[in-house]
């Protein structure tokens, strides 16, 4: 291979992971990141692998598909997982991180790596004659997005993603909330804001009639179900919220709770959960409350939540457009372009949805870019593993109806033999098989 380095464009979760995996294999990397010279609508810092929505990497149990994926990534030496583990904050059975400490750790490791050259500039064209990993994310700049869309025949794929508000803990009315994790899993890590039926109905009415921030007239709303604005969810009906982000099951009142409740019920009618957002525990985000209501409306409506009557919002929810590719047509399971084998794509732009999934795609793309550099065959993880099932899904889905996908047990290959009826036991068996199958790939 005449090329002496590999380009990685974009230093989000996927690009950071790809750059690390390539450099780890002894290959020089030129890592391009435009933040620092050009801002995006959502990013707040110039740190690599910044988390722009939630600070949660979601469930950590092996009976949870994303928990399995995280364990696979740990075993494959993921820089994202390593930094996340070093900057964990309490989150019950989930893995949440101090977003600033975590991002600084990723940035420092990549900046100090002897084989990684950091180039702070905007890339406006796709290199055609060099091995390149494009991981510019769902917030890809317009100029580069046009080039990527050209690979897609100019098709306009987009959807809207929304970020939840963050409040100052010191302004929360602690007399109206209680500390508890659902079903008491792990340590009590969430502040729970319980609602009576009357409080919930008033809140639902206010939420469904609140004024939303305007969208561009030429853009059609197309939401990904996993990050749907709370006001859109509310308009689908009361049960959508009660079985969604405000479900009360497993969040019974503590014995010493003195706030209002419906009669002698031990469980609230509805619950809004607040999750710690930084290591200091001074900030909490409103779980599942991604929104694009106008800021004044957010304050008015969300201060109806018990405990948040006088809460100070350090960040209001915001809305942005996310773009993704027609991966079933464009990519191989190694995240390699079908049109140009020297190009690899990674991250949410490929149709994987979520922080952990983005890191996983970067790991696979980085490994395969390095293998191409060394003139080795592409690596395809088996779809009995979580890290193999994601690229399998996005490259085998129906192109006409392709939508971003979180990792889940439904996309992992089923177990051989009779179906295990107990769900927990079935997921444990899938996880055990996945980690056993992954073992053969730990030295690649």
Curated annotation (Swiss-Prot):
Q: Quote the protein name from its UniProt record.
A: Methylenetetrahydrofolate--tRNA-(uracil-5-)-methyltransferase TrmFO
What is its subcellular localisation? Cytoplasm
Its main subcellular localisation, reduced to a broad class, is: cytoplasm
NCBIfam families named in the record? gid_trmFO (TIGR00137), PRK05335.1 (NF003739)
**Source species of the chain:** Streptococcus equi subsp. equi (strain 4047)
UniProt function note: Catalyzes the folate-dependent formation of 5-methyl-uridine at position 54 (M-5-U54) in all tRNAs.
Provide the GO MF annotations for this entry. flavin adenine dinucleotide binding; tRNA (uracil(54)-C5)-methyltransferase activity, 5,10-methylenetetrahydrofolate-dependent
**EC assignment:** 2.1.1.74
What gene, per UniProt, encodes this protein? trmFO
Q: What cofactor does its activity depend on? A: FAD
Q: What class of enzyme is it?
A: transferase
Residue positions annotated to bind FAD are: 10-15
**GO CC annotations?**
cytosol
């Amino acid at each position: 291979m005449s090329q002496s380095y590999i380009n990685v464009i974009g230093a989000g979760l996927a690009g950071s992971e790809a750059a690390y995996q390539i450099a780890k294999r002894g290959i020089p990397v030129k890592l391009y990141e435009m933040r620092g010279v050009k801002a995006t609508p959502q990013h707040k810092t110039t740190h690599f692998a910044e988390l722009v929505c939630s600070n949660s990497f979601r469930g950590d149990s092996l009976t949870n598909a994303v928990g399995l994926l995280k364990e696979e990534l740990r075993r494959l030496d993921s820089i994202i997982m390593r930094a996340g583990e070093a900057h964990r904050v309490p989150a019950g059975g989930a893995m949440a991180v101090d977003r600033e400490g975590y991002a600084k750790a990723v940035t420092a490791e990549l900046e100090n790596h002897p084989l990684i050259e950091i180039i702070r500039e905007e890339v406006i064209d796709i290199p055609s004659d060099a091995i390149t990993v494009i991981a510019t994310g769902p917030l890809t700049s317009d100029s580069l997005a046009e080039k990527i869309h050209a690979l897609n025949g100019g098709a306009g794929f987009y959807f809207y993603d929304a970020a939840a508000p963050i409040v100052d803990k010191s302004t929360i009315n602690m007399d109206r909330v209680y500390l508890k994790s659902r079903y008491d899993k792990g340590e009590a890590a969430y502040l729970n804001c319980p609602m009576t039926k009357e409080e919930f109905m008033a809140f639902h009415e206010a939420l469904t009639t609140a004024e939303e921030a305007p969208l561009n007239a030429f853009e059609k709303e197309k939401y990904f179900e996993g990050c749907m604005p709370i006001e859109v969810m509310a308009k689908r009906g009361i049960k959508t919220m009660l079985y969604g982000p405000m479900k009360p099951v497993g969040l019974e009142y503590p014995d010493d709770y003195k706030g209002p409740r419906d009669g002698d019920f031990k469980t609230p009618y509805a619950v809004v959960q607040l999750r710690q957002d930084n290591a200091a525990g001074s900030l909490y985000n409103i779980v599942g409350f991604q929104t694009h209501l106008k800021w004044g409306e957010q304050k008015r409506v969300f201060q109806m939540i018990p405990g948040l009557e006088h809460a100070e919002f350090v960040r209001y929810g915001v809305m942005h457009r996310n773009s993704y590719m027609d991966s079933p047509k464009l990519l191989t399971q190694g995240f390699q372009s079908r049109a140009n084998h020297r190009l690899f794509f990674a991250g949410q732009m490929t149709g994987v949805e979520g922080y952990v999934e983005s890191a996983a795609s970067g790991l696979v793309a980085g490994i395969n870019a390095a293998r191409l550099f060394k003139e080795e065959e592409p690596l395809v993880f088996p779809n009995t593993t979580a890290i193999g099932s994601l690229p399998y899904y996005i490259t085998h889905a129906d192109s006409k109806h392709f939508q971003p996908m979180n990792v889940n047990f439904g996309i992992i290959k089923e177990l051989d033999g009779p179906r295990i009826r107990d769900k927990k036991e079935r997921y444990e068996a899938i996880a055990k098989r996945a980690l056993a199958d992954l073992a053969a790939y730990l030295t690649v």
